[in-house]
UniProtKB/Swiss-Prot annotation:
CDD domains: UMPK_like. It comes from Dictyostelium discoideum (Social amoeba). This is Uridine-cytidine kinase C. PANTHER family: URIDINE KINASE. GO terms for molecular function: ATP binding; cytidine kinase activity; pyrophosphatase activity; uridine kinase activity. One of its GO terms (biological process) is UMP salvage. Keywords: ATP-binding, Kinase, Nucleotide-binding, Transferase.
Length: 449
């Protein structure tokens, strides 16, 4: 059967209802959406007027709501039920873990689904995350389109699986799911980014591996969402970078506003991690997480750099974390791949920043111009005589090139500057004991400072 062909078959558990033959391949978001709509239409046609129930499940931030809403947009007068509204605040919430399946009011959910399948009106609950409680009910009539969609991390759970005619799973890989979950929590619950990240490493992904991932493997349609969560970020930073070639301090002073200019020197210690099933040689900027130590304070940055003309355009999110967060990320399967020392002499006037960046591992000094206004950044580069001499790569990309070149030249291989901390045995041992992991990481990093 072609991967785009939908074959409707009787459900194994209920021969009077229908599903589709599972598709063998995982699908992109767009193809998954297209085939989900085709499958729903085909099952609906075969079901001759019965309400069909579609479950859409996946980890937090994977895109369940997005694909469900797109389906509703092309199948109007369908009903979309979000499992987020079925949290039961009367049940004990342990360590702010709202992803615990025991908090879901499956009895009410099953009643609502059964009512709608039986062409009866039903009262759907409404939940307020900012107040952590159910605040109202909404009466709905059976869907005129005969399509009922259930979306949520436990939408394929065994408690309701017998009610589903079609199962759709969606995931984005640990890295994108992690970032999108942080963005969602900040917007919806008012959490600070570091609080969301801590919760994810401590509770969300352990719950996912144990109680969600097995259900996703049962879906007839499996989607991998490659949506870039950085694409919608506002206020990107425009960066021009060049190898230092005769750019003097006096030249920099002449470019900046003399009345507001400030100068300082900073030393950074940047630790780069990549997600599971990724190698350093084949990784890209959207894969990396950078943990920076500056004067004993750690910050984490997710970055997706876009290249346009001479610019590196860098939408990013960064926030302060504790050193123990490294252990949490490694417990998710992230690996340390590089630790890079950097000394920056920084000149800024409130509008743009110009710096000399000395990279120990690269053995070079660079001039970098940054700002939120592309025109101002470009004009500064022109005045410094850097036009036609720009590099469109981040420092970790330049180091990656050096590493790959040493491999291809069969010369002395450039070793990754990580002190051997991320070998497989160390990672396995660390995963078995997060406390020891956090302590050893902290000691290792502090010894390098």
């Amino acid at each position: 059967m072609d991967s785009l062909e939908i074959e409707v078959i009787p459900r194994p558990d209920k021969d009077d209802r229908y599903t589709i033959k599972p598709l063998k391949d995982t699908l992109s978001f767009d193809k998954g959406f297209f085939l989900a709509v085709r499958a729903i239409q085909s099952i609906r046609k075969k079901s001759q007027g019965s309400v069909i129930v579609v479950g859409i499940a996946g980890p937090s931030g994977a895109g369940k709501t997005s694909i469900a809403q797109k389906i509703v947009s092309v199948l109007p007068k369908s009903i979309l039920i979000s499992l987020d509204n079925y949290l039961d605040s009367s049940r004990q919430i342990i360590e702010e873990n709202y992803d615990d399946y025991r908090l879901v009011d499956f009895e009410l959910l099953k009643k609502n689904i059964s009512d709608l399948i039986s062409n009866k009106p039903t009262d759907l609950p409404l939940y307020d995350f900012t107040k952590s409680g159910r605040y109202a009910y909404k009466r709905v009539q059976p869907p005129e389109s005969k399509v009922l969609l259930i979306e949520g991390i436990y939408a394929l759970h065994e408690e309701i699986r017998h009610l589903l005619d079609l199962r759709v799973s969606i995931s984005g890989g640990v890295h994108f799911d992690l970032i999108k979950r942080i963005f969602r929590d900040v917007h919806r619950t008012g959490q600070q980014p570091h609080e969301s990240l801590q919760q994810i490493t401590d509770t969300v992904y352990p719950m996912y591996k144990a109680f969600i991932e097995p259900d996703l493997q049962l879906a007839e349609i499996q989607v991998v969402n490659k949506f870039n969560p950085f694409g919608g970020l506002l206020n990107p930073i425009y960066i021009l970078k060049s190898v230092k070639q005769g750019v003097t301090v006096d030249m920099i002073h002449s470019v900046l506003n003399k009345s507001t200019i400030q100068e300082n020197t900073a030393r950074y210690y940047d630790i780069y991690l990549i997600p599971p099933n990724t190698t350093f040689a084949n990784s890209s900027s959207c894969d990396w997480i950078r943990v920076r130590n500056a004067d004993g304070q750690y910050s984490i940055m997710f970055s997706e750099e876009i290249k346009e003309g001479p610019f590196i355009i860098s939408p990013r999110v960064d926030f302060v974390v504790g050193v123990n967060m490294l252990g949490g990320l490694m417990s998710l399967g992230y690996q340390m791949v590089a630790i890079i020392h950097r000394k920056s002499t920084i000149f800024k006037d409130g509008k743009i920043i110009i710096s000399y960046d000395e990279l120990e591992e690269l053995g070079q000094t660079f001039v970098q111009i940054k700002g939120f206004d592309a025109t101002s950044v470009q004009e500064a580069g022109k005045k410094l005589g850097l036009e036609n001499n720009y590099l469109q790569k981040s420092y970790i990309e330049l180091y990656q090139d050096k590493y790959k070149k040493s491999l291809s030249d069969n010369s002395t291989v450039t070793t990754l500057p990580i002190g051997g901390i991320n070998n497989n045995n160390t990672i396995n041992n660390n995963n078995n004991n997060n406390n020891n992991n956090n302590l050893s990481l902290s000691n290792f990093i502090n010894s390098k400072l």
